[in-house]
């Protein structure tokens, strides 16, 4: 059985400009260039406006660059969304889906995250499905149940 890679990375949220992101990517690659990538893959998930520049700055042997979210349709009337085709066009490797801010601040559902997961996999992105409970759910002692449901619904229909 082939050994699976461990993925380790960061989401820069809405903190870095294009210049900041390119500098961060360059510094991260320089600092980690001597670390074997055989069993580990590093990734950075910057804001949308920095994706093209981050992808141009990356060394594909050292780093993956990903998107903070992705719509589940290739195109359409989805103001503010970004499609898998757009992400492929700028060289995106990995897509983060279901971040707590998308779920709890923007109200995205497990069913919507599932559509995104299936779409991302269909477009051959490495796909990160984020799961987690709120502080209130943790206080009620239902963390495991919440995460189990998020995983079950978020991965529904995934076959590989």
PLM features per residue range, with description:
Residues 1-160:
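Active-site loop-to-helix "anion-binding N-cap" substructures in soluble metabolic enzymes
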